[in-house]
Amino acid sequence: MSNTVLVSGASGFIALHILSQLLKQDYKVIGTVRSHEKEAKLLRQFQHNPNLTLEIVPDISHPNAFDKVLQKRGREIRYVLHTASPFHYDTTEYEKDLLIPALEGTKNILNSIKKYAADTVERVVVTSSCTAIITLAKMDDPSVVFTEESWNEATWESCQIDGINAYFASKKFAEKAAWEFTKENEDHIKFKLTTVNPSLLFGPQLFDEDVHGHLNTSCEMINGLIHTPVNASVPDFHSIFIDVRDVALAHLYAFQKENTAGKRLVVTNGKFGNQDILDILNEDFPQLRGLIPLGKPGTGDQVIDRGSTTDNSATRKILGFEFRSLHESVHDTAAQILKKQNRL
């Protein structure tokens, strides 16, 4: 039986870690990327592994975007991991840049599976987000508990006030579309659906060369604090985190384990604040002491009592593995950044 996995958005932060773990477990991987430049870079980075092939999908929101790939390779594919989705806040064209690409990209890949691989694809995993679960307006309410059953309450209209609200909602609409698709087409498809809903992502880039001056949104928080002058004020930011390596493993478990079928896997390992990150940086990296702010050491625990709570105990029970600690995740992220800057 085929052990081939299709991974959309193969050059993404999460997807690269997924590819690495799949190849280590001897899966055959077909990845989609947006350009021949990304294709060449990825093949080089994975040392032209014979189990990795790539296909070009320039725009996932374009009608029938995945038809060519599924028509060509669909008979080989047993599992599909759809990780491709826009992730940026710096836009004012919310429908064009966030809502429509996320929604249409998800619908497109599911329709292509239905057309060309309905008999061969057994499991589909969609990379969603905690933002599909969390309602922004309720994040600061300590009486609110978000779980695997929660949904972001934003509407198509109400979310279009800024990039953050629109991004949060885009993940909700894309995930909803996936669940609705499986329900409406249950007589025409073989696959079972699982979604993986991660929180803010920390952790190292898979390849050191991908550490640039500006990193993906979550890791840029750590990069930013590393480069914050010692006397500068630090924003009182708090949120929930997960390590990218754990998110990648959750994607594998999402199609490997029977008990994940039909589930939303909320992968997060609790709250953190900027003070927690500063404490780790100052404790673990002597070369940063006196160059970055101290803040108020040891007061990070105070964020635990603030704002809403995310209870993912059901997900933890299903997955059955321990998530990496904030300390490990921040340390590994910072160490890679400092190594690239010859400061380690």
From Swiss-Prot:
Gene3D superfamilies: NAD(P)-binding Rossmann-like Domain (3.40.50.720). Its EC number is 1.1.1.-. SUPFAM superfamilies: NAD(P)-binding Rossmann-fold domains. NADP(+) binds at K38, Y167. Keywords: Oxidoreductase. GO terms for molecular function: aldehyde dehydrogenase (NADP+) activity; oxidoreductase activity, acting on the CH-OH group of donors, NAD or NADP as acceptor. GO terms for biological process: response to furfural. Transmembrane segments: none annotated. InterPro entries: Epimerase_deHydtase, NAD(P)-bd_dom_sf, NAD(P)_dehydrat-like. Belongs to the NAD(P)-dependent epimerase/dehydratase family. Dihydroflavonol-4-reductase subfamily. This is Putative uncharacterized oxidoreductase YDR541C. It comes from Saccharomyces cerevisiae (strain ATCC 204508 / S288c).
